[in-house]
Swiss-Prot record:
Sequence similarity: Belongs to the protein-tyrosine phosphatase family. Non-receptor class PTPDC1 subfamily.
All residue ranges annotated as the Tyrosine-protein phosphatase domain in the record: 82-253
Lineage, broadest ranks: Eukaryota, Metazoa, Chordata, Craniata, Vertebrata
Name of the featured protein: Protein tyrosine phosphatase domain-containing protein 1
Residues forming the catalytic site: C190 (phosphocysteine intermediate)
A Gene Ontology biological process term: cilium assembly
Keywords: Cilium biogenesis/degradation, Hydrolase, Phosphoprotein, Protein phosphatase
Task performed by this protein: May play roles in cilia formation and/or maintenance.
Keyword Hydrolase attributed: yes
Stored Pfam families: DSPc
Organism listed in the record: Homo sapiens (Human)
Amino acid sequence: MAAGVLPQNEQPYSTLVNNSECVANMKGNLERPTPKYTKVGERLRHVIPGHMACSMACGGRACKYENPARWSEQEQAIKGVYSSWVTDNILAMARPSSELLEKYHIIDQFLSHGIKTIINLQRPGEHASCGNPLEQESGFTYLPEAFMEAGIYFYNFGWKDYGVASLTTILDMVKVMTFALQEGKVAIHCHAGLGRTGVLIACYLVFATRMTADQAIIFVRAKRPNSIQTRGQLLCVREFTQFLTPLRNIFSCCDPKAHAVTLPQYLIRQRHLLHGYEARLLKHVPKIIHLVCKLLLDLAENRPVMMKDVSEGPGLSAEIEKTMSEMVTMQLDKELLRHDSDVSNPPNPTAVAADFDNRGMIFSNEQQFDPLWKRRNVECLQPLTHLKRRLSYSDSDLKRAENLLEQGETPQTVPAQILVGHKPRQQKLISHCYIPQSPEPDLHKEALVRSTLSFWSQSKFGGLEGLKDNGSPIFHGRIIPKEAQQSGAFSADVSGSHSPGEPVSPSFANVHKDPNPAHQQVSHCQCKTHGVGSPGSVRQNSRTPRSPLDCGSSPKAQFLVEHETQDSKDLSEAASHSALQSELSAEARRILAAKALANLNESVEKEELKRKVEMWQKELNSRDGAWERICGERDPFILCSLMWSWVEQLKEPVITKEDVDMLVDRRADAAEALFLLEKGQHQTILCVLHCIVNLQTIPVDVEEAFLAHAIKAFTKVNFDSENGPTVYNTLKKIFKHTLEEKRKMTKDGPKPGL
């Protein structure tokens, strides 16, 4: 995008990189992002004729953005073009020209870097007075065919200079980027590669990593200075973030909460987010219904669960963590230097904490959750041994904090106002781990370190402390079968003994020993769940950091020994139970899956089941990676309770009273009745019925219980209510006929897919 008249405080990238003071300011300034132009400058850019703007802003035919001589080698990630790698796979660049393509062999450079897609955000004929003349055939400074003939995909999204696109258009562009990144690296350009390009990349980061808008803007600007220029563009990224929030909501009764929706409304939201094959497959079926039914059949047939390996490679998450950590480190260094130079007049610790709170306000004022780099498990800073290090900290952060801890200068009982950057009304009651404290701690250093490092430790949900994060919600990596999961285990305590797919629950053993009730508060969502808990106890993955709920007031060494001992015990119990469950026959597994669908759980651990379902509800609401991790859940009762709880939390029942009245009035034939409903209703119900059919022969009483429970969930009508018998008899006849017909179709042939 054209930069127009030089933005206020704009400096060339080479100057920013070579000037250490500017680097410190760029990385250390964590204040809310501001526009690069004044209000007057923005207004002028919209009213000055294009040829005059080009002449005044970037030099007309001698356009600086299209002249490689104006940029250092560091500013040319692709030689010959003003360009920067924003991530390892996304290149922001100024527009190339046919002359530059030939002179600098840019297409060959693209291929050598693995760039498979170029996205052009310009309109044909734009900036005709800048740089090299436009190609008459395309209206751009190059011919798109030059890239396409080399096997590089070309996309053009016309976007007005200095302007913004509609939110749905940006979402479509982001989904195209998501698809393109599966093929290889992506290059994006407008005119200068700053404004529109920066907005699109920031929106992609928000979409892919659930960063807040301001975090994404700061990250993009750290990689490509002066990006995202106008007030409208800043607002666009922020509004896009808000636009995505309700679309991502699966369970309206769980954090982050949203208004309840009907089935048709949910399917519309789902279509906004899905793309490609998945969008076509799930056009009329909620993803959670389809996935649970598929997982049930996999469990019943003891098929290996295919899921992505989240532990392979750091990917985008680590790159973002590193960049943001560097920015916080620079801020910490700056404040420590300021403190050392003013020893004679130490500032008030509360003022220091407030200063950091203000600087870091952008990381909590838009959303209260960010699963990418924050330490959800511990709100306080635990002893930083080699077992406790996180990618969220740079080595300098860790060393500095550990030195302070070893000197006894950082007690573990700092008030919540210092620990987190949330405002008081946003803060949640949390549990703390305690270690021996020095008699006279340096409160200023304590506040300084804690306030800076708390950038990483802001929790989004009080009840998510026990969930295993496994890094980023971005899942790069190969598809691998989870051997530990395919062992036929249906119990919660063996659900993925060695799998990253299981949400890990905190142990409450030490909570009951704590006389202080303030250390026992755990947040729960209020979604309705079904059935009773599966047998077994909650296990903790040995690679998962412990929740603060696990910690007593023990010294560091004792804490680590207990940590390792408990992990070994959990693994041993899980292994023995897994061997027992693997002995179930195929018929027994199918019956167990059918009982789960019918909500016939004979276990007595109802609260345990409810708690695990609530954890999955929060997980699905808070991060996209939960769809991958839930494939590791091996308890059919948890899966079915999760599915039915979603059905029952809809604003209106799947089958409304009007639908039932219509079926009764028309005396519809059972074979045709479902087709009288809307397609979303029909396909959703059929998906569940297909699942029970594919479980093959099941006991009559289990099937009857399934039909009764399905009718109750789909209609929200109890059998003993006023119209209950009519509703049940009408739908039971239709459902039974559908099951019989489907069984006839599959009796002598292969089982149809869901």
